[in-house]
C-alpha cells in the first residue's frame, strides 16, 4: 500500500487551527466567567442602591414626622403668647402635608398621631360663645375644657344653653382655663375659645357692668382657686362681680360633711346611670348583682375630701351598690384597686363604670373605658372577679338635673348682696 505522506505544511496548518480553537475556547470561557462575575456585582450594586434609597426615604419620613411632633409640643403649653396663633396654624399645615405613613410616625413629648388624627366629633356643632355685643349683664361660664368635640358641645354646651334659656336678659359667654386644650382645638379645628384673661378683657371692652362667673368645676379645688384669682384682678373693672358655687357646693370639714348640692348630684347621676343601664330601679340592679362606679379625676388639693363626702352621701341615700373612685387615687380609698376590693367584698359580679366628670373627654374615653392595661375597665377585667364590666361614656353636663343645679347656683349668685 502506498502511503501518501502528509505535507509538512498541512501538518503545521492543522496544528495552528487546533491551537486557535483552544485559544478561542479559552477566551470564550474567560469572557463568560467575567460576564457572570459582572452580573453578580451588578445585582449586588442594585440591591445596595435600593437599600440606600429605602433608608433615605425612611429617614425623610421620620424627619417630616419629627418636625410636626416638635410643632405640636410647642403648643402643648399652658401659657398663651403672641406666637400662639401662628404656631397653631403652622402645626396643622405641617400635619396636613404628611402622608398617612408619616402621620403614624409622629411621636414627641406630648405629640402623637391622635393629636390631629383622632375623630372626636363635629366641631361645627359647638358654639365657642366668643362674640362681642355682650351688653351690660354677662354670665361667664368657666370650664377646664375638653378637646373632644361631641363632649364639648353636649356637656359644656348643655350647661351654657341651660343658663342662657334661664336668663334671657343676660349674655352667656365661655372661657376655658386649660390653654393646652384651647390650643389643641384651635390648631385642629380652627375653633377659637377664650381663656380667662381673654374672656375678661372681652367683657371689659364690651362695657359689661354686671358679671357673674359660673364655674362648671366639680369642687373648690385648684382650678376654682385659680379662677377666683384671675377674677380678682379684674374686680374693679365692673360695677359688680360675683362668683357662683361649683357643682358640689361647699367642701365641709370632714368626709361626713354632706349638703343639698351633693345630695342632688348623687340622686341625678345615679338615676341617669340606672336608666341608661336599662334597670327600672337601683334596687333592681342590686338584685342582679350589679354595682355602679362613678370615676372622678381626683386631686391632691384639700378639696379631695369631696369625693369621700360623695361616697358618704351615697350611703346616706341608701345607695349600697354605688361607689366613688378617682383616676389619681386621691383620696387613697378611691383608687382603682381599693374600689375593686370594695366591690369584691360586697359580692357584686357585674360592674358599670361611668365618669363623675362634667365632660366625657380624655379621662372617660381612655382612663376609664380605654383598652390599655391601666384603664379602669382593663383593671376590673384583669382582676378576674367580675362576670361583666360595662361602661357609660357620658358627662354630667348633659344631664338635665345637673344643668338645673348650675342654674340654681347662678341664681343664688345673682341674688347675693
Locations of regions flagged by a protein language model:
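Hydrophobic core
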Residues: 28-36
